[in-house]
């Protein structure tokens, strides 16, 4: 039987999920009006910057630490269930790679504006709490949920998306040879079809996670990811078209053959 505290927390986590959707809509609208504040689109006025490798580690850390804390906690009743453990592990694997592997594979990388890094820390803290707390304390699944078609298809999409994301990052890292400083057109993999193959992979990841978790919290995360990364992808696409006359005109922005 749910306690009053448990019911209150479930309502809080649902409210946070809907808030995440609202913020996603605001981010999507803002990205249509102004450029991003980091990477190749950062303005010279952003003088306070953090080294790229350090920024990635610090900003992604909350989404790694919070699930680990829940796994270590003795007061996480839902993690006695296999579906909950697997779903939280999916979240943890992504951020383990993002926090502990990806930054140390980077070659150079422009320093990130402090504002962008701070915003990323806030998001990863809020979302890390939302996803890990929901799966460890609130989400209820049948023991055979891992054989449900929604879970199996979702897990397949998550795994495929993560592999696409990692492979696309590998292609981007290897665009420049030692001593090169300029930008080049990405070739190979899904970059033959879209400008932002790495973003497409990440969106697929979290859509798969949302399907496998079959929750408002998972869906909110996938929705926010699409709102944020689709705007970034559109900026990249327009930038490549301006910079390279030979840029393939048939490439879509982020979804092969569609958008």
From Swiss-Prot:
Its EC number is 1.3.1.22. The keyword Oxidoreductase applies. Induction: Its expression is regulated by androgens such as testosterone. It catalyses: a 3-oxo-5alpha-steroid + NADP(+) = a 3-oxo-Delta(4)-steroid + NADPH + H(+); androst-4-ene-3,17-dione + NADPH + H(+) = 5alpha-androstan-3,17-dione + NADP(+); 5alpha-pregnane-3,20-dione + NADP(+) = progesterone + NADPH + H(+); 17beta-hydroxy-5alpha-androstan-3-one + NADP(+) = testosterone + NADPH + H(+). It comes from the Eukaryota. PROSITE patterns: S5A_REDUCTASE. It is found in: Microsome membrane; Endoplasmic reticulum membrane. It is a multi-pass membrane protein. The keyword Secreted does not apply. Keywords: Differentiation, Endoplasmic reticulum, Lipid metabolism, Membrane, Microsome, NADP, Oxidoreductase, Sexual differentiation, Transmembrane, Transmembrane helix. GO terms for molecular function: 3-oxo-5-alpha-steroid 4-dehydrogenase (NADP+) activity; 3-oxo-5-alpha-steroid 4-dehydrogenase activity; amide binding; electron transfer activity; NADPH binding. Optimally active at alkaline pHs. Coiled coil: none annotated. Gene3D superfamilies: 1.20.120.1630. GO terms for biological process: androgen biosynthetic process; androgen catabolic process; bone development; cell differentiation; cellular response to cAMP; cellular response to dexamethasone stimulus; cellular response to epinephrine stimulus; cellular response to estradiol stimulus. The chain crosses the membrane at residues 12-29, 86-106, 111-131, 151-171, 209-229. Liver and prostate (at a low level). Its main location: membrane. GO terms for cellular component: cell body fiber; endoplasmic reticulum membrane; neuronal cell body; perinuclear region of cytoplasm. PANTHER family: 3-OXO-5-ALPHA-STEROID 4-DEHYDROGENASE, 3-OXO-5-ALPHA-STEROID 4-DEHYDROGENASE 1. Converts testosterone into 5-alpha-dihydrotestosterone and progesterone or corticosterone into their corresponding 5-alpha-3-oxosteroids. It plays a central role in sexual differentiation and androgen physiology. Belongs to the steroid 5-alpha reductase family. This is 3-oxo-5-alpha-steroid 4-dehydrogenase 1. It comes from Homo sapiens.
